[in-house]
Amino acid sequence: MVQSAPPITAQRNGVTPFITKLQAPLTKQPITTLQINLGRRCNLACTHCHVEAGPKRTEELSPEVCDQLIEIIRRFPQIKTVDLTGGAPEMNYGFRPLVEAARQAGKTVIVRSNLTIFFEPGFEDLPEYFAQHQLRVVASMPCYLEDNVDKQRGAGVYSSSIRALQKLNELGYGTDPALQLDLVYNPQVPRTEKFSLTPDQQQLQQDYKAYLEDHFGIVFNHLFTITNLPIGRVKQYLAAKSLYWPYVQFLEANHNGSTIGNLMCRDQLSIDYLGNIYDCDFNQMEHVPSKLPNGTALTVAHLLEAGSLDVLEEIQTRPYCYGCTAGSGSSCGGALV
């Protein structure tokens, strides 16, 4: 049973409740994407990780929940995309069964990879496996400069990531239309109150492409810019520096109402390794479950019993939702406007 955090209904520390800002409930649209968090196990422990994943984490998908998810993938043709994340999703139980079931059902499958997993014992075949099943690779690359990447993700991560990208290019990723390779930019966690919005996605993509091709011969399709939401390790760091509420206030001050129609929470379900369902991966990490109209927390078992994915009405919101609506907006697919 998920222990739900209490809803925030009144202004707190100068921050307007997100739902009050919208002046109307944030509602679900028909579900087209399942984002499945397979577990917390990861070979890295990045400072910006909202999942707080790492090598010592053991939580992962169970065979029972994996079977339920495969049934959902096969039963509902409205699902167009299955988005696999973690931790390092490749390290957690159920990764390959879910990939193969989803591809057999004709779904687009996204794997959110840290790239360095390719060089861990037992995972050396991953690049070829990705290509064989035509997985869309969304790879973490928080900067195109070595120093910044290694500061966020650990010494040597940049060089491993470069080798991994070159391997994917050799297999056709970034050039073959069936093998899409996208990179993800995360800004560094704020260290002072001199906050800034995520850089313009198109301009930064041009910078990434020019640098990586000129220096390493690497090509890729798209760059996604993602705002650091104040949850997980980012929240802990900001709170320790007394920057948590000032950062949330900054995000609210830059709220852009035109992002609302494109928010990823509207047409996706986020599912954890226990089979609990959330409106987004961020709510999952903050233990804010999706709720049926009667207040019951939604699970995968409920979906199978109901025979429908479209059982939710109102999306659960919290102050960190401003991270997805600030500036040009933010999502697992990058900027929104």
Name the predicted role of every residue range.
Residues 271-272:
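Short, acidic, Ser/Thr-enriched surface-loop or helix-capping motifs
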Residues 33, 53-63, 78-92, 103-167, ...:
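Core AdoMet radical
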Residues 3-86, 90-101, 105:
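Conserved alpha-helical substructure of the radical SAM core
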Residues 34, 70, 99, 127, ...:
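Generic structural signal for well-ordered alpha-helices
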Residues 45, 78, 133-134, 177-180, ...:
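Short loop/turn motifs at secondary-structure junctions
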Residues 138, 145-265:
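Radical SAM enzyme [4Fe-4S]-AdoMet core and its adjacent flexible, acidic
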